[in-house]
UniProtKB/Swiss-Prot annotation:
It catalyses: L-glutamate 5-semialdehyde + phosphate + NADP(+) = L-glutamyl 5-phosphate + NADPH + H(+). SUPFAM superfamilies: ALDH-like. It comes from Brucella melitensis biotype 1 (strain ATCC 23456 / CCUG 17765 / NCTC 10094 / 16M). The lineage of its organism: Bacteria, Pseudomonadati, Pseudomonadota, Alphaproteobacteria, Hyphomicrobiales. GO terms for biological process: L-proline biosynthetic process. Keywords: Amino-acid biosynthesis, Cytoplasm, NADP, Oxidoreductase, Proline biosynthesis. Disulfide bonds: none annotated. One of its GO terms (cellular component) is cytoplasm. This is Gamma-glutamyl phosphate reductase. The keyword Cytoplasm applies. Belongs to the gamma-glutamyl phosphate reductase family. Catalyzes the NADPH-dependent reduction of L-glutamate 5-phosphate into L-glutamate 5-semialdehyde and phosphate. The product spontaneously undergoes cyclization to form 1-pyrroline-5-carboxylate.
Length: 421
């Protein structure tokens, strides 16, 4: 680590801290004006963003990156439209800052309010998803936080082009341009500086990327972290499930987009309906281009599958691969999920209410779904506008991290001259 990088990052932290103060008291109208102007700027810069993305994609191809990686990196007309729409959706959300979460009166006449406040400065470290630049910048802005963005070198051109549009939004609303900053160096030493907190400037770190990145952040960070290590998501088909529904959900949960953290990685089927449900579901997946890795029982019923290893049950493929096992009803599903899950997202297809109740009560994951695809594990789908990530820990934020999760709170106590005496 060079002294120059430490100095550069210290200056980034200083600017962010300075910008956080006026941003914390910005009006909802100011923040929304900045967000809508940023969305306009992204659409106006569409050609520049696509050209920048082509440079990143060319480098990815040159470096032989996996198809799932390239998918996460790729921008097109529709995805740019979606980025702009996501920013506008965030602008329509209620302003969390200043919201009174709870209030009560004490016998001595004191009136107490618990009120949402910004966290301060958020550091976001991510890899190949250029859309995170927009999502993180917009969410932090709406919640009154300054943000320092450190994208991976693989998406550097795309992220820089999107970042320029975000700054235009800030300037249009007369908000500090330094409220959203992108780390100006690609050296990994910059990440190390962020994990130290930049001399107290950073209040929380949000990593969004692969297992090695998140593990490093959790290991080295000297500030709080909102993180998930991986998305080992399960889909359980119960004996009470409607087969047509199960087929639709299984195909979507795995194959809609295989490279996202909400994609199903393991399919569990109730042994009681294996003879009727397994082959149609796996046939759909195989026809869609998915590789099936099954337990010995699955292979006996579906010989086209490949043998699953012990490692498969704890692997996040992020690819067109799924591991499949038969289980003894809801009890077997709960046991398997609690053993192998990363506590991200699990789904059940079932019509029996008691079975669904057990699934919801006995599985400790951030997101649980009934009769719906795991791919709904997304802040946008939850009505949050977008998300900065999905947290699987239990402290402060859990599940999609949207504007509310990017706030803290303080107490306002109103009296009329009371003393304790």
């Amino acid at each position: 680590m060079t002294k120059d990088i430490a100095q550069v990052m210290a200056e980034v932290g200083r600017k962010a801290k300075a910008a956080a103060a006026p941003l914390s008291i910005a009006t909802n109208e100011q923040k929304n004006k900045a967000l809508n102007a940023a969305a306009d700027a992204i659409l106006e810069a569409r050609a520049d963003i696509l050209e920048a993305n082509r440079l990143d994609l060319a480098n990815a191809e040159k470096n032989g990156m996996a198809a799932s990686f390239v998918d996460r990196l790729t921008l097109n007309e529709a995805r740019i439209d979606a980025i702009a729409e996501g920013i506008r959706a965030i602008a329509t959300l209620p302003d969390p800052v200043g919201e009174v979460i709870a209030e009560w009166d004490r016998p001595n006449g004191l009136h107490i309010e618990r009120v949402r406040t910004p966290l301060g400065v958020i550091g976001v470290i991510y890899e190949s998803r250029p859309n995170v630049t927009a999502d993180a910048g917009a969410l932090c802005l709406k919640a009154g936080n300054a943000v320092i963005l450190r994208g991976g070198s693989d998406s550097a051109h795309s992220s820089a082009a999107i970042y320029k549009a975000l700054v235009k939004g800030l300037e249009a609303a007369n908000l500090p341009a330094d409220a959203i900053q992108i780390v100006p160096v690609t050296d990994r030493a910059a990440v190390g500086e962020m994990l130290k907190g930049l001399g107290g400037a950073i209040d929380v770190i949000v990593p969004r990327g692969g297992k090695s990145l998140v593990a490093r952040v959790q290991s080295e960070a000297r500030v709080p972290v909102f993180a998930h290590l991986e998305g080992i998501c399960h889909l359980y088909i119960d004996k009470s499930a409607d087969l047509d529904m199960a087929r639709r959900i299984a195909l979507d949960a795995k194959m809609r987009r295989t490279g996202i953290c909400g994609a199903a990685e393991t399919l569990l089927v109730d042994r009681a309906v294996a003879s009727t449900h397994l082959a149609p579901i796996l046939g759909d997946l195989a026809a869609g281009g998915c590789e099936i890795r099954g337990s010995a029982e699955v292979l006996a019923l579906y010989p086209a599958a490949k043998p699953a290893t012990e490692e498969d049950w704890s692997t996040e493929y992020l690819d067109a691969i799924i591991s499949v096992a038969l289980v003894d009803g809801i009890s077997g599903a709960i046991d398997h999920i609690n053993r192998y899950s990363s506590h991200h997202t699990e789904a059940i297809v079932a019509e029996d209410a008691q079975t669904v109740a057990r699934f919801f009560n006995e599985i400790d994951s951030a997101i649980l779904l009934h009769n719906a695809s795991t791919q709904f594990a997304d802040g946008g789908e939850f009505g949050m506008g977008a998300e900065i990530g999905i947290a699987t820990g239990k402290m402060h934020a859990r599940g999609p991290v949207g504007v509310e999760q990017l706030t803290s709170f303080k107490y306002r106590v109103r009296g009329s001259g009371q003393v304790r005496g």
